[in-house]
């Protein structure tokens, strides 16, 4: 395993451990980004189910022109995810950035989710 993969795996493990300690039963907003798309979901770890999800692959995103891996698509995904989560009764979450730094697309998604009604 390369040094970069080891570093990312350790960072991801460290972030998830700190989230478990501070979650207090709140669902987790998990983010995954690839080179072409961005995905986000709100997960209830106690029940083991996904409460809301959104990605840049969805038809509504493609019709709006927000496809791909740019900051505008991340903002649209964050807004859509927050709307779906609030509709399902979720208002407070913990933000799980995984091994990604809080910068760029990850930060844009988080800010859009906050503006649309989620608090973390």
From Swiss-Prot:
Keyword annotations: Ribonucleoprotein, Ribosomal protein, RNA-binding, rRNA-binding
InterPro entries: Ribosomal_uL18_bac-type, Ribosomal_uL18_bac/euk
Stored CDD domains: Ribosomal_L18_L5e (cd00432)
Family statement drawn from the similarity comment of this UniProt entry: Belongs to the universal ribosomal protein uL18 family.
Protein name listed in UniProt: Large ribosomal subunit protein uL18
GO MF terms held by the record: 5S rRNA binding; structural constituent of ribosome
Gene Ontology terms: cellular component: cytosolic large ribosomal subunit
The keyword RNA-binding appears for this protein: yes
Biological role stated in the UniProt entry: This is one of the proteins that bind and probably mediate the attachment of the 5S RNA into the large ribosomal subunit, where it forms part of the central protuberance.
Biological process, per Gene Ontology: translation
Source lineage: Bacteria, Pseudomonadati, Pseudomonadota, Alphaproteobacteria, Hyphomicrobiales
One Pfam entry name: Ribosomal_L18p
Subunit structure: Part of the 50S ribosomal subunit; part of the 5S rRNA/L5/L18/L25 subcomplex. Contacts the 5S and 23S rRNAs.
